[in-house]
Design a protein with these regions (language model features):
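Zinc-dependent deaminase catalytic domain
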Residues: 1-130, 134-287
Length: 287
C-alpha cells in the first residue's frame, strides 16, 4: 500500500491538513525544515514538542508493518530545528531481527540528511530496549530528551540507567560526529563507495554501504554500528528506509553493496534481503 493512501485514514483536522500540504509539495519527503516548523507552530500556537506530537500519526503512515501490523511513528529533532520523520519497517521474507524500529528510522533519516546532533526524539510508544541502546550511541545521548504522548521531557538515561555505550569502550567520536557525503557521485558504484567511507564503525572498522538505483535517482544507506553490536543499522535497511521516507515511488532496478576489507561483511544478509524483498541480484564491490 502506498504512503499517500495511508494518509486518507488520518482524521480530518486542520493541523493534519496543513502538514500534509507541505509534504505533498515536496513529493511526500517525510521532513520539515526548521522554517516550516516555526511557521506551523506559529499558525497553530503550539510549542515545538506539542507540534511534533501532533505530527506522529502522519509519521506512522510511513510504517511498513506486514508482520506486526503495529504502526509506530517517530520524529527526530535536530539541533538545526529540522524535523526528521521515521517509522518502523518490517521485512516478511527474512529474519525478524532485520526490522528497522521507528526511532532508528527517524535517526538514520537525520544522519543521511547530514544533521550533526539530535536534541529530542518524539515517538508514539515507549521506546523498547533495542531503541534505547541504539540512541545511547548518539553524540547527544547524555542530553537527549524523549517525548511520548503521555510523558514529555524525559532524559534518555532515565530509560537506560547505568548504560553501556561507546564511552565504555573509549570511543570519543560517536554517531553523528563523523563525516558526511560531500560530493554527488556520477554512478551507482561511486555512490556506494563514497557512502561506505562515511560509515560509523568504530568497533569493527567495516566501511559498508548500499546504493539503490530508483528511476534516475541514486539513494544510499551507510552502516551504523552500535557498542552492543545487535542494534547496529545495516546499510541496506538504511537505504530502504531512506528510500521510503523520501516518498520515492520509482521502482528499484539495481543495488550495489560496497565494502572495505574487514573482519565483517554484510554481503550475505544484504544479498538475501535484496533477493527476497526486491527480486534482484545485488552487485558487490570490494575496495
Amino acid at each position: 500500500m502506498s504512503i499517500s493512501t495511508n494518509f486518507f485514514r488520518l482524521p480530518n483536522m486542520p493541523i493534519t491538513s496543513a502538514v500534509l500540504t507541505q509534504l505533498a509539495e515536496q513529493h511526500y519527503h517525510a521532513y520539515l525544515s526548521a522554517e516550516q516548523v516555526k511557521a506551523l507552530c506559529g499558525q497553530f500556537q503550539l510549542s515545538q514538542i506539542d507540534f511534533a506530537l501532533a505530527c506522529l500519526p502522519i509519521a506512522a503512515c510511513y510504517s511498513k508493518a506486514p508482520i506486526s501490523e503495529f504502526y509506530v511513528g517517530a520524529i527526530a529533532i535536530g539541533e538545526s530545528g529540522n524535523f526528521y520523520f521515521g517509522a518502523n519497517q518490517e521485512f516478511e521474507s527474512v529474519s525478524i531481527g532485520q526490522t528497522v524500529h521507528a526511532e532508528q528510522s527517524a535517526l538514520m533519516h537525520a544522519w543521511q540528511m547530514g544533521e550533526k546532533r539530535i536534541t529530542d526524539v518524539v515517538v508514539n510508544y515507549t521506546p523498547c530496549g533495542h531503541c534505547r541502546q541504539f540512541m545511547n550511541e548518539l553524540n547527544s545521548a547524555p542530553t537527549l530528551r524523549i517525548h511520548l504522548p503521555h510523558s514529555q521531557n524525559n532524559a534518555l538515561h532515565s530509560y537506560l540507567p547505568d548504560a553501556f555505550g561507546p564511552r565504555n569502550l573509549n570511543i570519543t567520536d560517536c554517531l553523528f560526529d563523523g563525516p558526511t557525503q560531500t560530493t554527488q557521485p556520477v554512478n551507482l558504484t561511486e555512490a556506494a563507495i563514497e557512502a561506505a567511507r562515511s560509515s560509523y564503525a568504530p568497533y569493527s572498522h567495516l566501511q559498508s554501504a548500499v546504493a539503490l538505483q530508483a528511476g534516475e535517482r541514486i539513494i544510499t544507506g551507510r552502516y551504523a554500528e552500535n557498542a552492543a553490536f545487535n542494534p547496529s543499522m545495516l546499510p541496506l535497511q538504511n537505504a530502504l528506509n531512506f528510500y521510503r521516507l523520501q516518498g520515492e515511488t520509482a521502482s528499484i532496478s539495481r543495488v550495489v553493496l560496497a565494502e572495505n576489507q574487514s573482519k565483517l561483511s554484510k554481503k550475505e544478509s544484504t544479498f538475501a534481503l535484496v533477493k527476497a524483498e526486491l527480486g534482484l541480484e545485488a552487485e558487490y564491490i570490494a575496495f
